[in-house]
């Protein structure tokens, strides 16, 4: 472990736990996908997973500390994945309110993103979490190198937007910290699964009216300590199992 890896240690531990659980819940994809967490006020200093390492093996000491404004990042030893840099660097540079950014190609979110109509209607409590809180990117332009990353970041300027359904691609989830963001990612995948399975029945959907969907979303926004308790329990499970995620 070098000196850099001693910085933001608790934040690294939280990210490592999120990677481990994303893999356990099958929200990962080979050695692709990426999570990041800003550690300064303007969001330009951020932590992110190393290039080409499986989520199930990432430890706190593996996580990179990057500067979104450093033009030489990709030429340095141990450079991040170029699409991770293009997407997350752009979001942290342009959207300082997005403290934590999680991008995956999880199965149900990606199925939703592959439909001609990628809207997520409020048909239960979990889908209602995201009512009027997501944006659909319908302009997929290839891999998320710098230009594509900047285009995506331009759609996330409104702090109310917590999820980007990335058409033909996957999902991008934003939050205030690791627990908030991972909890949102977990529930988005569950919500997408519920919707996809409901569509598979071929039966009409029981969609909530606008006022009830909006009320439910607001109530869930304010639900006390749910994300923190969820993530604390996930870390406790890893600790009980003797996982090395926090090393």
Language-model segment annotations:
Residues 1-247:
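Glycine-rich flexible loops
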């Amino acid at each position: 472990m070098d000196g850099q890896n001693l910085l933001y240690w608790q934040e690294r531990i939280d990210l490592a736990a999120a990677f481990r659980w994303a893999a356990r819940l099958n929200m990962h994809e080979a050695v692709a996908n990426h999570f990041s967490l800003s550690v300064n006020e303007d969001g330009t200093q951020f932590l992110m997973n190393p290039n080409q390492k499986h989520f199930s093996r990432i430890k706190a000491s593996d996580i990179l500390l990057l500067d979104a404004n450093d033009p030489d990042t990709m030429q340095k030893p141990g450079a991040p994945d170029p699409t991770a840099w293009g997407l997350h660097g752009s979001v942290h540079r342009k959207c300082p309110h997005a403290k934590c950014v999680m991008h995956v190609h999880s199965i149900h979110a990606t199925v939703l993103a592959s439909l001609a109509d990628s809207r997520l209607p409020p048909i239960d409590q979990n889908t209602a979490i995201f009512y009027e809180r997501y944006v659909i990117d319908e302009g997929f332009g290839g891999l998320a190198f710098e230009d594509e990353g900047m285009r995506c970041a331009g759609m996330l300027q409104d702090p109310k937007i917590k999820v980007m359904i990335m058409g033909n691609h996957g999902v991008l989830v934003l939050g205030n910290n690791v627990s908030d963001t991972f909890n949102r990612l977990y529930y988005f995948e569950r919500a997408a699964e519920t919707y996809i399975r409901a569509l598979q029945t071929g039966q009409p959907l029981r969609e909530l009216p606008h006022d009830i969907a909006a009320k439910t979303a607001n109530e869930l926004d304010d639900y006390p300590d749910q994300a923190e308790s969820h993530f604390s329990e996930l870390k406790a499970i890893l600790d009980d199992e003797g996982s090395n995620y926090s090393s």
